[in-house]
Amino acid sequence: MPLNRRKFLEKSAVTGAGVALAGAVTAPGAQAAEARGGTKRGVKRYAFTVMGTTDLHGNVFNWDYFTDKEFDDKDHNDIGLAKISTLVNRIREEKGRRNTLLIDAGDTIQGTQLSYYYAKVDPITAEGGPVHPMAQAMNAMDYDAAALGNHEFNYGIPVLRKFEQQCRFPLLGANALDAKTLRPAFAPYSMHRLRTPFGRDVKVAVLGLTNPGIAIWDKANVQGKMTFPGLEEQAAKWVPKLRSMGADVVIVSAHSGSSGTSSYGDQLPYIENAAGLVAEQVPGIDAILVGHAHTEIPEYFVTNKKTGQQVVLSEPLKWGQRLTLFDFELVWAKGCWKVEKVGAKVLNSNTVEEDRKIVRLLSDEHEKVVAYVNQVIGTNAAEMTSAEAPYKDVPIIDLINHIQADTVKQALAGTEHASLPVLSQAACFSRSARIPAGEVTIRDVAGLYVFENTLEARLMTGAQMKAYLEFSANYFVQTAPGAQVDPAKLTNANGTPDYNYDVVSGLAYEIDIAEPAGSRVTNVRFEGQPLADDAKFVFAVNNYRANGGGNFPHVAASQLLWSNSDEIRNTMIAWVKAKGAVDPAEFAAVDWKLTRNGTPVF
């Protein structure tokens, strides 16, 4: 779909104005609204609240489509926009509707089977297709603006553009640029007027910034179409413009964590988690709604190096588990509004019931998806679970690798690389995945592979595979010989997520956790013999990893032999359907194990 920037920006300007006007109309709770302004010794003051969500990932209801029951975790969190809507309604009633804004920091349309269904099964892009459930819910909640997340691009630009059309609020991305013109491909900002009791409006600018890693993670969807420069440089460009346009308050909605780190190393010159750097380097920002990192930060202050101003950051927990509140207090001074004080906190969505309006609005869509994921596609001879997958070779991960290797072998049949052995990588995306004995449903398989990754075949050498395995082994915490091994504390060294620990099928190897990172992988063998450095292999690998996700060595620069446009999840579902019966005895094997001084840990 062509990127008609002018048409979109005209639409966004109209939409943004409509949002701002709606926020200015007197609503129920007008008495509370009037109380938000006041005078003390002749000084005019005004207070307002900006509410924020992030990383909703397709969660409307407090429901887990993979387990087919209400969501629950060890902390008894709840999820979904229906819960958040109840919190939003309470804040609007308390503060006064016209004294609030509601924004989001991205990753909205990917992550659940609900969002998948309306991207792929009953797609919103079809002629006369449905309105995306996330658009319906967010429109009903009167969102004022939302930044783009990296996962917005997972289904391709046409799906994103259709979602954008269906939203009654602007999608913001000041650093999502048209690759040819280098002009914004989305609205960079939105401007909102809040009417005060004094007749002097407060102008609030929301600047949206997305993640530079999109260029790596969704290379197939964006290469040659869009480019994604760093957050710091784009904020430095736009914040002065917003101030010159009369913005009294500038809020950044950033789909970027605050740690200053990048999972992709030096593959890009831009920082992945740059929200803290933006606050530190760019003057004129009052608050930053942080996203992407899936961490909870109720309130965090960063000092701007140029002005000494304290900038408040807040990140609400993912999936609608928390709602951020930025509470602003302004004072009228020297002919304009000045921020006198701003603080942040989060509200827990498990303290309220779901908003019945949202439940009624989307109950039909929910039931369609529940019926879809419960379709039986085959049988399984023995239960498989991922509970021990981070530290043991288990059949459920072997299943992923078996299907991937089988798919690549078939794809390369008759080609010059058909005779090469095929290795495959897989990671544990969920420690709660389970494929039961007996009937297997779509949700059983989908729960094992929760990301929209596609499959590629790359050409790798033995030496490169050794380096790949060594990098993956950084995932484990060094544990001295004789020390007690606690599986709960053994993994995720230096914050490495489970999805960045790959196991490789087709090779046998050991990981010595007593050794320091970088020298752990030993006894690497292929077909019983020591792995030769010059041996050549076809490597079945997901597109996230193949494009540099996780910064694994060699794979991103390796030769591409084949790629598939369909998700690995769908490939797995189709494989189970075609086979009809799954038996772990046919593919399960202990290819790798953890050791200390040659002695197995488990």
Regions found by a protein language model. Name each.
Residues 2-19, 23, 29-351, 396-403, ...:
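Acidic, metal/ion-coordinating pockets
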Residues 41-49, 59, 72, 79, ...:
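Feature captures C-terminal
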Residues 201-203, 385, 508, 530:
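Short, solvent-exposed loop/turn motifs
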Residues 281-282, 383, 407, 411:
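Alpha-helical structural context
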Residues 342-346, 365-366, 380:
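Extended, charge- and Ser/Thr-rich helical segments
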Residues 350-357, 373, 379-380:
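Acidic, Ser/Thr/Pro-rich beta/coil linker or hinge segments at domain junctions
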Residues 363-374:
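Acidic, glycine-rich low-complexity/disordered segments
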Residues 375-393:
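Glycine-rich phosphate/diphosphate-binding loops and the adjacent beta-loop-alpha structural elements
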